[in-house]
Amino acid sequence: MILACDVGLKRIGIAALLNGVILPLEAILRHNRNQASRDLSDLLREKNIQVLVVGKPNESYADTNARIEHFIKLVDFKGEIVFINEDNSSIEAYENLEHLGRKNKRLATKDGRLDSLSACRILERYCQQVLKKD
């Protein structure tokens, strides 16, 4: 199975590719980086993940890229790690919330649903860029 994550300072959005369908999973709430990396490691083990797709912004965001790379090094994972450009994935995910009212959009932003929808976009890009080549 393939899992994608959108690493943020407060939450880590999670999405999985299951039988050709991309599904958002419950986001990991990040209290500190060690707890969050442990939670992600546990999830990768529980779901028997072979490929972890990680969203990263373009090179002009050097600090963010360094933070994401450092976090991923803390994750206990022996499978393949693929970095995919995440530019605008959060904006695209937010546009997917058009059907929600303003209050529910705010709640989706706070509880991690938006982050997991962003992880879905990252996983879609992985499927388009990497899996199509095979």
From Swiss-Prot:
Q: Which GO terms describe its cellular component?
A: cytosol
Which keywords appear in this protein's UniProt record, sorted alphabetically? Answer: Cytoplasm, Hydrolase, Nuclease, Ribosome biogenesis
The UniProt entry's GO biological process terms, in alphabetical order, are: rRNA 5'-end processing
InterPro entries given in the database record: RNaseH-like_sf, YqgF, YqgF/RNaseH-like_dom, YqgF/RNaseH-like_dom_sf
Per the UniProt entry, the Enzyme Commission number(s) are 3.1.-.-
Q: Which CDD domains match?
A: YqgF
According to its UniProt record, this protein's enzyme class is hydrolase
Which stretch is the leader sequence? none
GO MF, one annotated term: nuclease activity
Subcellular location(s) per record:
Cytoplasm
HAMAP family reported for this sequence: Nuclease_YqgF (MF_00651)
Q: Which family does it belong to?
A: Belongs to the YqgF nuclease family.
Give the function comment from the record. Answer: Could be a nuclease involved in processing of the 5'-end of pre-16S rRNA.
Record-linked PANTHER family:
POLYNUCLEOTIDYL TRANSFERASE, RIBONUCLEASE H-LIKE SUPERFAMILY PROTEIN
| Name of this protein | Putative pre-16S rRNA nuclease
